[in-house]
Amino acid sequence: MGKQKKTRKYATMKRMLSLRDQRLKEKDRLKPKKKEKKDPSALKEREVPQHPSCLFFQYNTQLGPPYHILVDTNFINFSIKAKLDLVQSMMDCLYAKCIPCITDCVMAEIEKLGQKYRVALRIAKDPRFERLPCTHKGTYADDCLVQRVTQHKCYIVATVDRDLKRRIRKIPGVPIMYISNHRYNIERMPDDYGAPRF
């Protein structure tokens, strides 16, 4: 038996005229886009983000005792691992009264971690912690912390996460608290606060 030839049936595909075809009337024809020539002498407009008046260059005048410290999920976990009391260690680091703050997103993140991190959840529910409500959608804590710190420059961010630290370093005037050598340390503080470095 021979092989059957597959012939293309005529007019199966609808033939369309291009919108630039010469056979179309002038009014129906698509006009070619003209490229706008850029004037090299014209001033270029740029959107520069406005910095708040509380900043004097990198110096943040809004920071002062009692310090409000935004706590990240992994900061609580690493503190438990290093056997550090959160509030007491913060006070030892800054030599002043500290109010640890925890957002709804961080709380939800700790709850999602499950039974293994129940100690972290118990610490997060401590009455000494100030609870900050979140109004945005989603429960990704890193974005929440970065957004909150960008809006209000009165916080210190406590985290051990490298990516979050990198993101916060781009925001001027926001100090970062981290754990090193089984003690809390602070980075980018306006005055010489913080535990001595070894």
From Swiss-Prot:
Chain ranges of the PINc domain: 67-166
InterPro entries per UniProt: Fcf1/Utp23 (IPR006984), Fcf1_PIN (IPR037503), PIN-like_dom_sf (IPR029060), PIN_dom (IPR002716)
Protein's cellular compartments: Nucleus, Nucleolus
S-S bonds: none
Region described as Disordered: spans on this chain: 22-47
Molecular function per GO: RNA binding
Main location: nucleus
Keyword hit for Hydrolase: no
One GO BP: ribosomal small subunit biogenesis
Top-level lineage group: Eukaryota
Gene Ontology cellular component list: nucleolus; nucleoplasm; small-subunit processome
Biased composition (Basic and acidic residues): 37-47
Binding partners and assembly: Part of the small subunit (SSU) processome, composed of more than 70 proteins and the RNA chaperone small nucleolar RNA (snoRNA) U3.
Role, per record: Part of the small subunit (SSU) processome, first precursor of the small eukaryotic ribosomal subunit. During the assembly of the SSU processome in the nucleolus, many ribosome biogenesis factors, an RNA chaperone and ribosomal proteins associate with the nascent pre-rRNA and work in concert to generate RNA folding, modifications, rearrangements and cleavage as well as targeted degradation of pre-ribosomal RNA by the RNA exosome.
Protein name: rRNA-processing protein FCF1 homolog
Natural source organism: Homo sapiens (Human)
